[in-house]
Design a protein with these regions (language model features):
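S-adenosyl-L-methionine-dependent methyltransferase catalytic core, i.e., the SAM/SAH-binding region
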Residues: 1-367
Length: 367
C-alpha cells in the first residue's frame, strides 16, 4: 500500500487520533548559574530550554511580547480562512517551523486528510515532529521530511503524490525558536556564534561568508536583502573589520555595524538598522531568494486544478517576488484568481505579537 492511499485505520472523527497524546511535563525552573558568570552560550541562555513559568509566559504574551524559545504563528485565522482545509484533502506546509500552522491545518483535514510538512532546519525539525506526534498526528496523517521548500516538486513524487496537492502554505519567516536561540546567530539581541545557517550542516556560516565577501557584493546584499539606506557605509566597515580577522560572534557584528552609524541616529533607528543588516546577511548565507525563485517556478505544477496557495513574507524582497509571480501567472492563465492586495495582521494581532508587524500574505488559486 502506498503512502497516498488512505486506509480504514485512519481517524474517522475530527482531531488527531493516531496515537495517545504525550503527558504534559511539569513546570521546572531553570537552575541558577554557578559562579558569577555563565561559562558558555547554552548556560547563559538556559531559560530557552527550561520549562516555562506559566505566570511569566502569560505576562509576556499580555504585553505583546513572544516568550524566549516559544513561537506564535502569524496570520493563522486569515491563512486558515483562505486555505480552508477539508476532510480527505492533501496539503503541504513547506516551512514547518514550530508547526503552529500545520497543527491547525491537520485538524481541518480530518478525517482522512494528509499533510506533507517540509523544513530544512536539522535542529528544529525533530523537536517539532516530537511535538506534533505527541498531539496524536501519526505517520498516516502527517508526513515530515527534511527538505528545503524549493524541493517540493521533487518531494511529492517521492511520497507517491504524483498528481499534486489541494493546497500549499509557505511561511517565509524565521521561527521564534530560531531567533531566540543564541547558538544559531540570527539575532543581534543575543550574543552567540555568528552562524545564521538554516541548515548548520551545509554551506558557509555567516562568519565565513563575511570573511570572503567583497565590498561591492556586500553593498548589493544589503540593498537587495533589506533596502538598507546606509549600505555603502556599513559594507565598508564590515569589509575593513573582516580584513583584520573574522567576525566570530553576533556581538562583534553588532558593534561593527554600530560603528558605521551616524552619531545622531535614534535608538529606534539603531535597532532597525541592526535588524535589517542581520536579515540581509542571513538571506545571503542561506541563498533564500534563489530558493524562493525555484519554489515559485515549480509551484503551479505542484497544485491540483483549483489548488490554493498562501505565502507569508516578511520583507520587500520576498514580497516582490511573490507578487510578480502571482500577477504574471494570473495574466497567463496559470492562476484563475489572486489576492487583489496584500493581507496584513490586524492591529490586535500586532499588539499581541509584535513580531507579526512586518508580515504580508498573498494567495492564489490554480486554474
Amino acid at each position: 500500500m502506498t503512502d497516498d492511499e488512505p486506509t480504514s485505520e485512519e481517524p474517522t472523527s475530527e482531531g488527531p487520533t493516531d496515537q495517545e497524546p504525550a503527558k504534559e511535563k511539569p513546570f521546572r525552573r531553570r537552575q541558577r548559574y554557578r559562579g558569577t558568570h555563565p561559562r558558555n552560550f547554552n548556560e547563559k541562555y538556559k531559560e530557552l530550554s527550561a520549562s516555562p513559568d506559566p505566570e511569566t509566559i502569560a505576562k509576556l504574551i499580555d504585553s505583546g511580547k513572544t516568550p524566549a524559545g516559544q513561537h506564535r504563528p502569524i496570520l493563522v485565522t486569515e491563512t486558515l480562512e483562505f486555505l480552508a482545509p477539508q476532510p480527505g484533502e492533501r496539503g503541504a506546509d513547506v516551512t514547518l517551523g514550530h508547526g503552529g500552522h500545520s497543527e491547525r491545518l491537520l485538524t481541518g483535514l480530518q478525517p482522512g486528510g494528509q499533510l506533507l510538512a517540509l523544513d530544512v532546519d536539522a535542529l528544529q525539525l525533530p523537536l517539532t515532529e516530537e511535538r506534533l506526534r505527541g498531539l496524536g498526528f501519526g505517520t498516516k496523517t502527517l508526513t515530515i521530511r527534511r527538505c528545503n521548500f524549493a524541493g517540493l516538486a521533487g518531494m511529492l513524487p517521492q511520497i507517491g503524490w504524483h498528481d499534486g496537492v489541494d493546497f500549499v502554505l509557505a511561511d517565509l519567516g524565521l521561527s521564534s525558536m530560531q531567533i531566540d536561540n543564541p547558538a544559531r546567530g540570527f539575532s543581534y539581541k543575543y550574543d552567540g556564534p555568528l552562524d545564521m545557517r538554516m541548515n548548520p550542516e551545509r554551506g558557509l556560516s555567516a562568519r565565513d561568508w563575511l570573511k570572503r565577501c567583497r565590498f561591492e557584493k556586500l553593498v548589493r546584499v544589503l540593498i537587495d536583502g533589506s533596502d538598507e539606506p546606509l549600505a555603502e557605509q556599513i559594507a565598508a566597515v564590515l569589509v575593513e573589520v573582516s580584513s583584520r580577522g573574522p567576525i566570530n560572534t553576533t556581538g562583534q557584528l553588532r558593534l561593527a555595524i554600530e560603528s558605521a552609524l551616524p552619531e545622531d541616529i535614534t535608538e529606534a533607528g539603531r535597532r532597525s538598522t541592526l535588524a535589517r543588516v542581520f536579515q540581509a546577511i542571513r538571506i545571503a548565507v542561506n541563498e533564500e531568494f534563489s530558493a524562493l525563485d525555484t519554489f515559485l517556478r515549480c509551484l503551479p505544477g505542484c497544485l491540483l486544478p483549483g489548488g490554493r496557495v498562501a505565502i507569508l513574507s516578511f520583507h520587500s524582497g520576498e514580497d516582490r517576488r511573490v507578487k510578480h509571480h502571482f500577477r504574471d501567472g494570473f495574466r497567463s492563465g496559470v492562476y484563475r484568481e489572486i489576492a487583489p492586495d496584500i493581507i496584513r495582521p490586524t492591529g490586535q494581532e500586532i499588539r499581541a505579537n509584535s513580531r507579526a508587524a512586518s508580515a504580508k500574505m498573498r494567495w492564489a488559486i490554480r486554474s
